[in-house]
Structures are given as C-alpha cells and as structure tokens.
Design a protein with these regions (language model features):
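N-terminal helix-turn-helix DNA-binding core of bacterial DNA-binding proteins
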Residues: 2-48
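Generic detection of well-ordered alpha-helical segments
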Residues: 13, 17, 54, 83, ...
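Residue-level recognition of specific faces of alpha-helices
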Residues: 22, 29, 52, 88-91
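Canonical helix-turn-helix DNA-binding module
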Residues: 37-71
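Basic, amphipathic "hinge/linker" alpha-helix immediately C-terminal to the N-terminal HTH DNA-binding motif
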Residues: 68-91
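Amphipathic alpha-helical dimerization/coiled-coil segments
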Residues: 87-127
Length: 127
C-alpha cells in the first residue's frame, strides 16, 4: 500500500476523525478525550483510543505530554501538522452535516428506484 494512503486511512478512520476534531478545541487528558469522543455515539474502548493516539502520534499529528507527577498526567494535543489536517477533516465533517438533507433525498430516490426495479423484475415472467 502506498504510504500516503496509509496516512489517509489513519486520519479518516472512525476514531481518528473524532480525535482530531476534538483536539482542535484544546488539549485533553486521556479520560477526557475518551468521554468527548464517546459523545458522538458508541464509546471508544481504552485499547482502541490508545492505539489510535499512538498511530496519530507516530504520524506526527498528535503530541503526547507525560508529566512526571503522582498520579501520572498525560495530555494530548495537536502538532502544527495535526492542526492542519484536523481543520481539513473538520471542514469535511461540517460539509457532510450541512448536506445530510441532500444525501437523505438521494438515498430515498435510489432506494425507490431499486424497489421499483425489483417489483418490475418479479412481475416479468421471463425473469
């Protein structure tokens, strides 16, 4: 697989998108980020959040700041590169949200056409 496609997969993955958008507002601790991402539907597991954060950190999008205190404190924030990609992802998410009415209408037209085609096929004795 081409390296740029792999990075695109990381950025546009189910959790990658939500993490990047959430970190645009401010840095988050792990538990804060997990709760914030969970607001968008089914929650993310600790394992998946950890894996996604590590992947985004490796790609240079997320900075992990572990503070040597007790109890341990780790903050996650966007790098300059991460902020740039997160703004692009957020723009796509906002566009999608704004166009959902049109997408819904297109889906209804498509489904109606498929149903009509299916009914016509059932009525045709040659089928």
């Amino acid at each position: 697989m081409c390296p740029h496609r792999l990075v695109l997969e990381h950025v546009t993955s189910r959790w990658g998108v939500l993490i990047l958008i959430e970190l645009l507002d401010r840095p988050h601790r792990f538990s804060e980020l997990r709760r914030a991402v969970g607001r968008f539907g089914r929650g993310v597991s600790e394992k998946m959040l950890t894996q996604t954060l590590q992947t985004l950190e490796r790609d240079g999008f997320v900075h992990r700041d572990a503070k040597p205190v007790i109890p341990p404190r780790v903050d996650y924030s966007l790098t300059a590169l991460g902020r740039e990609v997160a703004e692009q992802v957020r723009a796509l998410a906002l566009w999608t949200e704004a166009r959902m009415g049109e997408v819904g209408e297109a889906r209804e037209r498509y489904d109606a056409a498929k149903r009509a085609l299916g009914a016509a096929t059932q009525d045709d004795p040659r089928a």
